[in-house]
Amino acid sequence: GDFVRIGREFLDIFKTEASLLPSDTVLDVGSGIGRMAIPLTDYLENRYEGFDVVPEGVNWCQKYISSRFPNFNFQLADIHNRSYHPSGKVRANAYVFPYEQDSFSFVFATSVLTHLLPDAVDNYISQIARVLKPDGRCLLTFFLLNDRSRENLECGHAQADFKFDNGTY
């Protein structure tokens, strides 16, 4: 999709659906190449933290975003991923987010949990709960598996091909 447009649309969603304020402390789980961070640079006054498993994306964000916006920090998650970070040392289902408990008023993950197996999703949700302040908000995106999407999968009409048995999810 359109990189800039989608980032701006999500900023609007963060503000309207999750009541994002400029004063919020934000964690971007799976920050990628900054699609969500870039529009936040014009809005967020407080701390932003992002992490990702793709070294090139983290390096780009550090070079082009953090250098201009010192309240925006990006770090590489040393999570093993065959496609994105094969040298990673930690499995996603055991990864501990590198932040203190109750650190963030808003946490989001867009197009992240759809890349994880159920035990890793459980871990990520537990980690989000740990780092989220008691009155914090969270926005996560998922694939919707309902009767219609299951029918499309079975008929071969789905846009995404699920390689794993989705009956156990």
Predicted ranges, named:
Residues G1-E17, R35-P39, L44-E45, F51-V96, ...:
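Class I (Rossmann-like) S-adenosyl-L-methionine-dependent methyltransferase catalytic domain
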Residues S111-V112:
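Short catalytic micro-motifs in class I SAM-dependent methyltransferases
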Residues L117-P118:
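Helix-capping/helix-break motifs at membrane-protein junctions
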Residues S23-G32, E49:
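Conserved class I S-adenosyl-L-methionine
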Residues D122-P134:
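A short glycine-rich, Lys/Arg-flanked "PGG" loop and its adjoining helix->strand segment in the class I
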Residues F108:
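A conserved beta-strand element that flanks and buttresses the S-adenosyl-L-methionine
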Residues T25, G136-R137:
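Short glycine-centered segments of the SAM/dcSAM-binding site in methyltransferase folds
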